[in-house]
Swiss-Prot record:
Organism: Escherichia coli (strain K12)
Protein name (Swiss-Prot/TrEMBL): Protein YecV
Triggers of expression: Expressed in both exponential and stationary phase in rich medium; expression is higher in exponential phase (at protein level).
């Protein structure tokens, strides 16, 4: 579930 976490972080940082 690391990929999901990274996607969420990237969306918030974008």
């Amino acid at each position: 579930m690391s990929i999901f976490r990274i996607h969420l972080d990237g969306n918030k940082k974008a």
